[in-house]
Curated annotation (Swiss-Prot):
This is Large ribosomal subunit protein bL20. PROSITE patterns: RIBOSOMAL_L20 (PS00937). GO terms for cellular component: ribonucleoprotein complex; ribosome. Binds directly to 23S ribosomal RNA and is necessary for the in vitro assembly process of the 50S ribosomal subunit. It is not involved in the protein synthesizing functions of that subunit. Transmembrane segments: none annotated. The keyword Ribosomal protein applies. SUPFAM superfamilies: Ribosomal protein L20 (SSF74731). Keywords: Ribonucleoprotein, Ribosomal protein, RNA-binding, rRNA-binding.
Amino acid sequence: MARVKRAVNAHKKRRVILERAAGYRGQRSRLYRKAKEQVTHSLVYAYRDRRAKKGEFRRLWIQRINAAARANGLTYNRLIQGLSLAGVQVDRRILAELAVHEPATFASLVQTAKAALPANTSAPKVAANA
């Protein structure tokens, strides 16, 4: 059986790892073993954070909607409840965009939600200053 020489493949494998590690600090960009460990961890972080990003954006949208809703006299949960009762199907991303870029349109959605809510539920609770 013929002998297999691995020099070309080994050099290519190491070069690919070191290219991926370009820009890392210190030994992590220059030494193969350290670079390999860091590239592996970086791929794990990237995989994890691609999934975490979705939740982070949802939380950001909810904060923006809540701030704009409170400026219009409703809390976030009452706004969502009112829109649901009114049959308005707008997702949180679009609501947040409207709240930031088109306040008049968002205010009309708040009025629609207020009209759909039962009585005595549209006013947000005010914290008592004791």
